[in-house]
Amino acid sequence: IMPSLVGSEMCIRDSHNAAECETTGRSRDLALLPWGVMSEENYMRIIDLRGKKLTRAEMLEAMPRAEMGTNEATELVQPILDDVKARGAAALRDFAEKFDHIRPENLRVPAEAMKAALDELDPEVRAAIEESVRRCRAVSASQVPAPFHTDLAEGARVAERWIPVQRVGLYVPGGKAVYPSSVIMNVVPAQAAGVESLAIATPPSRNNSDGLPDKTILATCAILGVDEVYAVGGAQAIAMFAYGAKGSEPQDGEILCDPVDKITGPGNIFVATAKRMVSGIVGIDAVAGPTEIAIIADKGANPSWLAADLIGQAEHDELAGSVLITDSEELADKVQESLRYRVPRTEHAERVNTSLRGRQSGIILTDGIEQSIDAANAYAAEHLEVCLLYTSPSPRD
């Protein structure tokens, strides 16, 4: 018997699928609730959909979701936007000191620092980055839409031409980990589209006494030929891109950063909120929440690999969502076992533990591949991984 908090009710787990609620004295099916069933020995809660014919609304309700707290984020972000708009670089340095615990001397990364980072980059890491760039360029080139026109009558033509945005601000997160992949996935599509002016903002690294960003990030920027890089993170970086920033120190110049036409890139809830709040004056790609992954797997999948992928997503952020969808209870148990071994040994164990145990993560048990697909579509994850040993041709190809 295990107490489990479901909404505002304290429930006692007494069977595989049911709970007796102390507050009402009646049985409620936990499988339909986002919180599911959790035990102290396991890292991830179980959401059991087996044997249930769910409506679309019930399926959506059963999915694990985080509570974002956007109202609180808005109240915190608005003063940051206002201060950067009013004071420019001076505000950026103050916020770096407050949030990143370092005060960068150079907000714009000097060219010599970029070159030094590239020269010092491990050859194997450089080779991996260059291969990632090559692959991303191949995909991005195929995504550029072709112009077209239709002649309706003599002198009457309807046409569409795709014209690149002139200047784009690219945000690369870096407060909790290093993401050269975010540099690549921001820069390469913009270059393929023909954007002429690219500026990157990424947080200063606490590991660098000079307040510059992580050297791998700088080296990746150098490989891609981007030389306008700022040691600025968080909502203040979004404000800098949206409004521009006047200089406050001699090394800044009169204008530290010109405003951009569009802002792209991932970030935490404060970055996402800032992008939403400036979207009326500058274009944005999307208001993305914390990163998430859904994995559809059957009994043939390797539980250790699945656990590693769930951990890899969870280490991004305490609110990151990691969801396993499977029709094999045996596989689910083995994944939990692997997590019990792996999580305490990972570098960011505390963050991973919080993420995996959060209401945004869980293991969804299904009757089969068809229901697994329905659950994956309802969850609609940012990243979808499919690990199936065998399936018939019919399940949605």
What are these model-predicted stretches?
Residues 1-14, 390-397:
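Single conserved hydrophobic/aromatic residue that forms the stacking wall/gate
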Residues 150-219:
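Conserved small-residue-rich beta-alpha loop and adjacent elements
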